Curated annotation (Swiss-Prot):
This is 2-hydroxy-6-oxononadienedioate/2-hydroxy-6-oxononatrienedioate hydrolase. The record marks 114 as: Transition state stabilizer. GO terms for cellular component: cytoplasm. The gene is mhpC. Keywords: Aromatic hydrocarbons catabolism, Hydrolase. Homodimer. Pathway: Aromatic compound metabolism; 3-phenylpropanoate degradation. Gene3D superfamilies: alpha/beta hydrolase (3.40.50.1820). The lineage of its organism: Bacteria, Pseudomonadati, Pseudomonadota, Gammaproteobacteria, Enterobacterales.
Length: 288
């Protein structure tokens, strides 16, 4: 029987999660039926969703025999919106913990991009016994860069897009989001803009969250040595959102970790170099 590609609509699910005395309706996609589960956590860009972030990576993981969970973090996608005054990554980690508890999944492999990487570190620090392997892409530490003025050019454009969600600002951000912009089609821009504008509450609440606490992503650097999970770090050589030395900091802080740097690659390695990225991750997950 030939493999049937996963679709967003067929795998769409919702669960209610309690957070700070409130009930949040959280959206996720549940793909495949493997014995091992890989959770994919998206970044913080306006209009981001689990599915949009990892659309080029889902089928290879499912075909390899993994169950794949794609979470829409609160404030993104079809999940409820929220104003967050604490650590955004710890919030995402708590939400994920509740979701996998309700799904009765004892242990997960975590694969996170940007904010998703930082949230994966938060989850691992809080519940290390629940984590199999860890893949961190373009995020995970927080803190300052040794070589790049902060906030970076990319983060400045991202914040501008949140405050003024126009097609012009979206193109300005995406122009430095990836290394090769030839794949940035009008259809992609239109889909991303529609995602953003369909949930203006997400955009407004992200800005309110930054105003309540500008440091939504705290520095986990001093605690990286606590991580014992096998860890693969992936970075784009030309990342203009999170500097490459953040990846070196992860490599130095997490014992036994390894770092793969893609050349001609921006902040979206899993999309820009999808085939090579997928093989890299599958080899890592299959390794004893």
């Amino acid at each position: 029987m030939s493999y049937q590609p996963q679709t967003e609509a067929a795998t769409s699910r919702f669960l209610n999660v309690e957070e700070a005395g409130k009930t949040l309706r959280i959206h996720f996609n549940d793909c495949g039926q493997g014995d091992e589960t890989v959770v994919l956590l998206h970044g913080s860009g306006p209009g981001a969703t689990g599915w949009a972030n990892f659309s080029r990576n889902i089928d290879p993981l499912v075909e390899a025999g993994y169950r794949v969970i794609l979470l829409d973090c609160p404030g993104w996608g079809k999940s409820d919106s929220i104003v967050n005054s604490g650590s955004r990554s710890d919030l995402n980690a708590r939400i994920l913990k509740s979701v996998v508890d309700q799904l009765d999944i004892a242990k997960i492999h975590l694969l996170g991009n940007s904010m998703g990487g930082h949230s994966s570190v938060a989850f691992t620090l809080n519940w290390p016994e629940r984590v199999g392997k860890l893949v961190l892409m373009g995020g995970g530490t927080g803190g300052m860069s040794l070589f790049t003025p902060m906030p970076t050019e990319g983060i400045k454009r991202l914040n501008q897009l949140y405050r003024q969600p126009t097609i012009e600002n979206l193109k300005l951000m995406m122009d430095i989001f990836v290394f090769d912009t030839s794949d940035l089609t009008d259809a992609l821009f239109e889909a991303r803009l529609n995602n953003m504008l369909s949930r203006r509450d997400h955009l407004e609440n992200f800005v309110k969250s930054l105003e309540a606490n500008p440091k939504q992503f705290p520095d986990f650097g001093p605690r990286l040595a606590e991580i014992k999970a096998q860890t693969l770090i992936v970075w784009g050589r030309n990342d203009r959102f999170v500097p490459m030395d953040a990846g070196l900091r992860l490599l130095s802080g997490i014992a036994g970790s390894e770092l793969h740097i893609f050349r001609d690659c921006g902040h979206w390695a899993q999309w820009e170099h999808a085939d090579a990225f997928n093989q890299l991750v599958l080899n890592f997950l299959a390794r004893a």
